[in-house]
Amino acid sequence: MLKFTVHKTSGGARRGTLELNHGTVETPVFQPVGTYGSVKAMSPVELNDIGAQIILGNTFHLWLRPGLEIVEQFGGLHEFIGWDKPILTDSGGFQVFSLSDMRKLTEEGCTFQSPINGDKLFLSPEISMKIQTVLNSDIVMQLDECTPGQVDHATAQKSLQMSLRWAERSRRAFDDLKNPNALFGIVQGNLYTDLRQESLEGLMQVGFDGIAIGGLSVGEPKPEMYRMLTELKDMLPADKPHYLMGVGTPEDLVHGVANGVDMFDCVMPTRNARNGWIFTQWGDVKIKNARYKDDKKPLDEECACYACRNFSRAYLHHLHRVGEILGARLNTIHNLFYYQELMREMRKAIEEDRFEDFRLEFAAKRARSVN
């Protein structure tokens, strides 16, 4: 089930709702990444407290561990991990294609060695749909082929055409399995506008509940990613949710929303938090820096997260320097809260038709740098 409604626009930005089997999501939305069924360093209660509406699970990794049999015994991923809100699962394609020296790609699918024990495994559109049906994720992604950051036109076209054939197979398998959830197609085509259009037109013929933009933030220069988003803005169907996969920084989120993107996911706020890189409205904090060793201020005096309400930069600096796990947890709570707050602010700005003003204020604040 999926019902998507756009309630308000401001320039190219859209404010909507996404009704799914496990609840309604307010868009634009950021999805924390829970690779193995867990958002690193966060409990489901903490995710709920910071305002997370939907999380992402990784089909490839959950297939390998704990395996479908275990998840199926629990009745699906929601029950297994104790999360009652929506979940999106990727198709497993990106992880498989990252194993470039351990895989063989054919029209049927991809044969590869398990990175865990070396077993020979095979992933096809049909198998990906079966896995995601067992997981019972609210949003299922088609299996596609991912190209590196920059390839020639012919290579990109050959790849996207196979992805379109796999899109048709994903759609058929999804329907044959009588999966009651939503299925998204993925636009590929590298950095070539004509190929992106070809991909999108093919997906529209197949018929999907939402459209994802894949193959960006994979090593291409940032201006090229922004150019492609701008060019895609007017091509994407207005009545379907637009999902930018694997992106990104706070600036990327604002730029994406300005270009009609409704959904994002990225490991950046959690991964950076564990490495002591913290995002705030005033710029980024590298908490390991000696300048913070006796700083009594919170990370952001205007932030309402648990870390900022209770702890100083000096304490977070200390925790990071001695390698205490609490430091990684507090940094993660803050970063994810900041990302959720940024999305809340963008939703409010769109509702009040002042998104462009918000965008200018956001850039000015982030440029000021942390005091």
Swiss-Prot record:
<feature type="binding site">
    <location>
        <position position="334"/>
    </location>
    <ligand>
        <name>Zn(2+)</name>
    </ligand>
</feature>
<feature type="binding site">
    <location>
        <position position="215"/>
    </location>
    <ligand>
        <name>substrate</name>
    </ligand>
</feature>
<comment type="similarity">
    <text>Belongs to the queuine tRNA-ribosyltransferase family.</text>
</comment>
<protein>
    <recommendedName>
        <fullName>Queuine tRNA-ribosyltransferase</fullName>
        <ecNumber>2.4.2.29</ecNumber>
    </recommendedName>
</protein>
<feature type="binding site">
    <location>
        <position position="303"/>
    </location>
    <ligand>
        <name>Zn(2+)</name>
    </ligand>
</feature>
<comment type="function">
    <text>Catalyzes the base-exchange of a guanine (G) residue with the queuine precursor 7-aminomethyl-7-deazaguanine (PreQ1) at position 34 (anticodon wobble position) in tRNAs with GU(N) anticodons (tRNA-Asp, -Asn, -His and -Tyr). Catalysis occurs through a double-displacement mechanism. The nucleophile active site attacks the C1' of nucleotide 34 to detach the guanine base from the RNA, forming a covalent enzyme-RNA intermediate. The proton acceptor active site deprotonates the incoming PreQ1, allowing a nucleophilic attack on the C1' of the ribose to form the product.</text>
</comment>
<keyword id="KW-0819">tRNA processing</keyword>
<feature type="active site" description="Nucleophile">
    <location>
        <position position="265"/>
    </location>
</feature>
<feature type="binding site">
    <location>
        <position position="144"/>
    </location>
    <ligand>
        <name>substrate</name>
    </ligand>
</feature>
<feature type="binding site">
    <location>
        <begin position="90"/>
        <end position="94"/>
    </location>
    <ligand>
        <name>substrate</name>
    </ligand>
</feature>
<dbReference type="GO" id="GO:0046872">
    <property type="term" value="F:metal ion binding"/>
</dbReference>
<feature type="binding site">
    <location>
        <position position="305"/>
    </location>
    <ligand>
        <name>Zn(2+)</name>
    </ligand>
</feature>
<dbReference type="InterPro" id="IPR050076">
    <property type="entry name" value="ArchSynthase1/Queuine_TRR"/>
</dbReference>
<dbReference type="GO" id="GO:0005829">
    <property type="term" value="C:cytosol"/>
</dbReference>
<feature type="binding site">
    <location>
        <position position="308"/>
    </location>
    <ligand>
        <name>Zn(2+)</name>
    </ligand>
</feature>
<keyword id="KW-0479">Metal-binding</keyword>
<feature type="active site" description="Proton acceptor">
    <location>
        <position position="90"/>
    </location>
</feature>
<keyword id="KW-0808">Transferase</keyword>
<dbReference type="InterPro" id="IPR002616">
    <property type="entry name" value="tRNA_ribo_trans-like"/>
</dbReference>
<keyword id="KW-0328">Glycosyltransferase</keyword>
<dbReference type="GO" id="GO:0008479">
    <property type="term" value="F:tRNA-guanosine(34) queuine transglycosylase activity"/>
</dbReference>
<comment type="subunit">
    <text>Homodimer. Within each dimer, one monomer is responsible for RNA recognition and catalysis, while the other monomer binds to the replacement base PreQ1.</text>
</comment>
<keyword id="KW-0671">Queuosine biosynthesis</keyword>
<feature type="region of interest" description="RNA binding; important for wobble base 34 recognition">
    <location>
        <begin position="270"/>
        <end position="274"/>
    </location>
</feature>
<comment type="pathway">
    <text>tRNA modification; tRNA-queuosine biosynthesis.</text>
</comment>
<feature type="region of interest" description="RNA binding">
    <location>
        <begin position="246"/>
        <end position="252"/>
    </location>
</feature>
<keyword id="KW-0862">Zinc</keyword>
<feature type="binding site">
    <location>
        <position position="188"/>
    </location>
    <ligand>
        <name>substrate</name>
    </ligand>
</feature>
<dbReference type="InterPro" id="IPR004803">
    <property type="entry name" value="TGT"/>
</dbReference>
<dbReference type="InterPro" id="IPR036511">
    <property type="entry name" value="TGT-like_sf"/>
</dbReference>
<dbReference type="GO" id="GO:0002099">
    <property type="term" value="P:tRNA wobble guanine modification"/>
</dbReference>
<dbReference type="Pfam" id="PF01702">
    <property type="entry name" value="TGT"/>
</dbReference>
<dbReference type="GO" id="GO:0101030">
    <property type="term" value="P:tRNA-guanine transglycosylation"/>
</dbReference>
<dbReference type="GO" id="GO:0008616">
    <property type="term" value="P:queuosine biosynthetic process"/>
</dbReference>
